């Protein structure tokens, strides 16, 4: 029994020692376990950890991720040297950022539990906004926090009536009643039918076309210059005014240049013809009272008087 084979058999039977192989993790992942069974893994430092079935199927994760996920859980027994070195680094990162990972995990878990318990209110948008406001309230600063605080009063101000119809409060309706009312204009407009049915003479006076060329100060405007829309009564009034003006001018002229000697009977005929010559313009042209015109008229009268005297002799 002292040979090498006997000693090896005796050691396997009476002193079993488990030596961890480098690929033991793959062996654990490949084994098929039942739902309620758990596997106890023995490490080199005699630390036992219970691993459920769901954790065994996720063995594709790296060692660093598995160690980071179990930092917040209590450990049984001493940790390996690598874990003890990485744990202070994680704690330093949490202190630098100002937010611990455990606090964020707890807040997320509490929000999920609250949503599961209140499943009936989860579908409404108002509850979603209120929950988000309570979760994000510590992180809001300045104007964002003010806007979030003003959200609830505005929602309370609106009144829901019927099947979701919103109505403004009574104060807004009272303000709307004070809007000034502008009455309709009293004056007739250009496109109104009252202007179309107006008197034709007034309409002609309103829409009278004035000539672009302004007349001279000493000459009265002609009838043709007043436009084609002037009625017959206005034309007759203009003609009468022109005739009266010409007769007054001629009468004043003959009074100033009265005859110094008695004229024969033939002069009366010439005098009757002269006004027709001066008054021949019926369109309102007024004779200018210049010195040259007066001299020409005097010479014409003298010539006609001499011819009449020769005929009488």
UniProtKB/Swiss-Prot annotation:
| Record's bilayer topology term | Peripheral membrane protein
Q: Which UniProt keywords apply?
A: Cell membrane, Membrane, Phosphoprotein, Tumor suppressor
Q: Where in the cell is it found?
A: Cell membrane
Phosphothreonine: modified positions: 104
Q: Which GO terms describe its biological process?
A: regulation of cell cycle
Annotated positions of the Phosphoserine modification = 60, 64, 107, 237, 240
Q: Name one GO cellular component term.
A: cell periphery
Q: Which InterPro entries match?
A: DUF4699 (IPR031528)
| Transmembrane segments annotated in the record for this chain | none
Q: Which terms does the record give in the GO molecular function aspect? A: RNA binding
Q: Which portions of the chain have biased composition (kind: Basic and acidic residues)?
A: 269-285
Positions of region (Disordered): 40-89, 253-286
Residue spans of biased composition, Polar residues class = 60-73
The role this protein plays is: Acts as a tumor suppressor. Acts as a tumor suppressor for colorectal cancer cell proliferation by targeting KEAP1/USP17/ELK1/CDK6 axis.
User: What is known about its subunit structure?
Assistant: Interacts with KEAP1; this interaction prevents the ubiquitination of KEAP1 by TRIM25, thus protecting KEAP1 from degradation. Found in association with PDCD10 and members of the STE20 kinases, such as STK24, STK25 and STK26.
The entry's protein name is: PDCD10 and GCKIII kinases-associated protein 1
Where does this protein come from, organism-wise? Mus musculus (Mouse)
Q: What lineage, starting at the top, does this entry show?
A: Eukaryota, Metazoa, Chordata, Craniata, Vertebrata
């Amino acid at each position: 029994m002292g040979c090498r084979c006997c000693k090896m058999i005796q050691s396997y039977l009476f002193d079993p020692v488990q030596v961890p192989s480098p690929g033991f993790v793959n062996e654990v992942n490949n084994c098929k376990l039942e739902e309620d069974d758990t596997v106890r893994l023995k490490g080199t430092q005699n630390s036992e950890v219970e691993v459920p079935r769901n954790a065994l199927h996720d063995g594709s994760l790296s060692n660093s991720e598995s160690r980071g996920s179990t930092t917040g859980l209590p450990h049984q027994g001493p940790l390996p040297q690598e874990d003890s070195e990485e744990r202070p680094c994680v704690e330093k990162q949490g202190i630098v950022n100002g937010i611990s990972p455990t606090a964020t995990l707890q807040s997320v878990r509490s929000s999920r539990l609250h949503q599961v318990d209140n499943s009936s209110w989860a579908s409404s948008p108002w509850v979603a906004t209120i929950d988000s406001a309570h979760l994000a309230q510590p992180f809001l600063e300045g104007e964002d926090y003010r806007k979030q605080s003003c959200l609830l009063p505005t929602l309370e101000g609106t009144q829901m009536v019927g099947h979701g119809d919103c109505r403004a409060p009574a104060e807004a309706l009272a303000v709307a009643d004070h809007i000034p009312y502008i009455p309709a204009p009293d004056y007739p407009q250009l496109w109104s039918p009252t202007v179309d049915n107006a008197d034709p003479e007034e309409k002609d006076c309103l829409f009278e076309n004035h000539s672009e060329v302004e007349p001279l100060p000493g000459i009265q405007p002609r009838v043709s210059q007043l436009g084609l829309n002037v009625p017959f009564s206005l034309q007759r009034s203009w003609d009468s005014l022109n005739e009266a003006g010409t007769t007054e001018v001629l009468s004043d002229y003959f009074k100033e240049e009265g005859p110094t000697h008695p004229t024969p009977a033939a002069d009366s005929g010439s005098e009757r013809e002269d006004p027709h010559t001066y008054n021949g313009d019926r369109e309102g042209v007024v004779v200018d009272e210049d010195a040259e015109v007066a001299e020409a008229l005097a010479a014409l009268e003298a010539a006609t008087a001499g011819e009449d005297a020769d005929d009488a002799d």
